[in-house]
Amino acid sequence: MRFALALLLIASPAWAWEPGPQVLGGLARGPYVEVRPDPDGASGLIRAAEEIAAPPEIVWSLLTDCALAPRLAPSLKSCRILERDPAGRWDIREQISRPGLMPRFRSVVRSDFEAPRRLRFRRTDGDLKVLEGEWRLTPVRDGRATRVVYESRAASPYAVPGSLARLVIRRDVTLAMAALKRESLARAMSPR
């Protein structure tokens, strides 16, 4: 039993990427976004980072707002909560996306929350073959700003050339990080 559990933990994705000094130094110029093929060839690995001049609680409130999600993610057309933990530790969402010129697809995702620091998500149903990852929020500048780190694996439900899929994902993630920053700054500046 212990061996099986250890094997499961080893086989599970480890979301431990931390941006290095070169990435962090470049965040003043805009978000860092990296999209590359997964070594197993079945999916793509996405890594992104951004620094936002707003406290983690503000950024968190935007990341977890299903109604706002289509404004933050360019290819997301709708987001609907199907089930929610009464204690607020998780929810299950149905999302309809239409990236670029590709047909629309449906994904059902369970998100586990460690407010306001970590949001882990994984596919539970839908068209995507693979979808799992996390958002991490780290307070910086004495809590007045937030370092946002995003890491995920995703695989298209359609036969798409890898280079085209990576191009669309890179564009969408870059736009999503910019929208998250824009909305966070607007909320941070608004009178309470």
Stretches with model-predicted labels:
Residues 11-13:
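N-terminal signal peptide c-region/cleavage motif recognized by signal peptidases
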Residues 16-85, 175:
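Hydrophobic ligand-binding cavity/cleft-lining segments
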Residues 1-6:
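Sec-dependent signal peptide recognition
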Residues 123-171, 175:
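Beta-strand/loop substructures that line and gate deep hydrophobic ligand-binding cavities in soluble
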Residues 37-43, 51, 70, 80-128, ...:
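Glycine-rich portal/gate segments that line the openings of hydrophobic small-molecule binding cavities
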Residues 59-60, 69, 148-150, 180:
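Hydrophobic pocket/interface hotspot
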Residues 51-55, 97, 112-114, 138-140, ...:
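Solvent-exposed residues in well-ordered beta-strands and their adjoining turns
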